[in-house]
Amino acid sequence: MLTKITFFERFEPGILSGAKTITLRDEAESHVFAGQILPVSTFEADRWFCDIEVIDIVPVLFSALTEQHAAQENMTLPELRRVIQEIYPGLEQLFQIRFCLVQ
């Protein structure tokens, strides 16, 4: 089970503003549960910047990603597809973790 979660620094403003409300992860990073509070750090420097609460987690296929997923990720669908392919090249099975910022 995850006890913390990391994001690339470029996603920090979207998380803190509430514009980014989901993250797409592979199975290794899918072991969370609704109601879980996770400290959030930057991937690059492991710098804590907030806590999030997991709302839910659902499986989603890369080929089934929509504009709604992209909006929840605070980017366009082409951007989302590119980013996912950079992080998880060739991976079809993803897990959507929906979260909210803990104030």
Swiss-Prot record:
Catalysed transformations (reactions): N(4)-acetylcytidine + H2O = cytidine + acetate + H(+); N(4)-acetyl-2'-deoxycytidine + H2O = 2'-deoxycytidine + acetate + H(+); N(4)-acetylcytosine + H2O = cytosine + acetate + H(+)
CDD domains, sorted: ASCH_yqfb_like (cd06552)
Residue positions of the active site: 20 (proton acceptor), 23 (nucleophile), 73 (proton donor)
Molecular function in Gene Ontology: hydrolase activity, acting on carbon-nitrogen (but not peptide) bonds, in linear amidines; N4-acetylcytidine amidohydrolase activity
Keyword Hydrolase assigned: yes
Coiled coil: none
Alphabetical UniProt keywords: Hydrolase
A cellular component annotation (GO) from this entry: cytosol
UniProt xrefs under Pfam families: ASCH
Enzyme Commission number(s) of this protein: 3.5.1.135
Domain ASCH per the UniProt entry, residue ranges: 6-92
Signal peptide start-end: none
Free-text function comment from the UniProt entry: Catalyzes the hydrolysis of N(4)-acetylcytidine (ac4C).
HAMAP family, alphabetized: ac4C_amidohydr
Similarity section: Belongs to the N(4)-acetylcytidine amidohydrolase family.
Name this polypeptide is given: N(4)-acetylcytidine amidohydrolase
Lineage of producing organism: Bacteria, Pseudomonadati, Pseudomonadota, Gammaproteobacteria, Alteromonadales
